[in-house]
């Protein structure tokens, strides 16, 4: 990593922070660790790391400060240790930057095929797309590791073997700060308002995502072009419409001589140089319900085609993909009523896409509202029979739902019970909160687990 014999401060001692400290120590650096919480410091001390408060103990002789993704470094208020690093001229990086530096310095002379990295970013669909890429590669017999926001931390993966593909899911928190971003293939799924306070607005949010493409210049880029930001990004990356480095992905019809993958009415189609190269029916794939998952499938398809896989191999792998927990996860069918957990739909765009995947919906929503308002949901709510609102501020959230029929429930147990009592055979009780979970839960996973637990009570 280039820090042999040098001091590096690691700020934040959760999973990624401790992994960074271990990797730095193994690479010959002196890792100095700090966390504002006593528990984090205790974990680091138990592993033999030096505890070093960068404010109290200073930054003299420090070559770099490595921070965890959850710690603000710019907006809304940067952590004081990062401010001190800026003032002292100390570079600030994160585990993603360390990973790419380490990979770039690797000796792959004994590999017939050096490892390749696929990095996936975007507002929604990152996890499903990343997991689906890894699943397809595994089914095809290609060695693969899944890391980043999904799977293991990037510094916890095994040393890559010959021909292996490393698939990394990256959030805007990670792409914004990493000092090295050099994937072989980069994916941009879509963009919608999220994390705006952290990035100083929509422009800053998009700029954070865009760094994945502008910093390292990936050999291939798979870009969702349904939004103007994706169209702009695609236009910035190529020399002309026939530039084979770009694969455009859309839920609508695309034209031109380039390399395109589109999903319309449940069919995935690949076009190259204006001619159709493949067509796959996604309508009966149980692990990929709805138009939003078809877009995820198109992104994964584009990556795997760029890696040399045949369409029939990808199609066969689609059929065996089981989906991810808390993302359009079918939990149960009780008396003809379906229960679906999409707790990961933490913003308006994700919830809108979830609502578009089902016919008659009993919609459980609410939580910690994000910037941007909820008005965009109104048009997507045509299939909603009633909304069942949860959250500490459920009354206020309900006021933003317009004319959608609603029942202010407050907690998950009440919402599931009332939705179940109202539901008719053929209905779907859908948890798609359109909000963060932190008012009542410590994560969207915990919220989804509560939904599942309440449904299991109905079954028993």
From Swiss-Prot:
Q: What would be an example GO MF term here?
A: UDP-N-acetylmuramoylalanine-D-glutamate ligase activity
Enzyme Commission no: 6.3.2.9
- In Swiss-Prot or TrEMBL terms, this protein is called UDP-N-acetylmuramoylalanine--D-glutamate ligase
Which UniProt key words apply to this protein? ATP-binding, Cell cycle, Cell division, Cell shape, Cell wall biogenesis/degradation, Cytoplasm, Ligase, Nucleotide-binding, Peptidoglycan synthesis
Query: What's the source species' lineage?
Result: Bacteria, Pseudomonadati, Pseudomonadota, Alphaproteobacteria, Rhodobacterales
Q: One GO CC annotation, please?
A: cytoplasm
Spell out the PANTHER family in the cross-references: UDP-N-ACETYLMURAMOYLALANINE--D-GLUTAMATE LIGASE
| Signal peptide segment | none
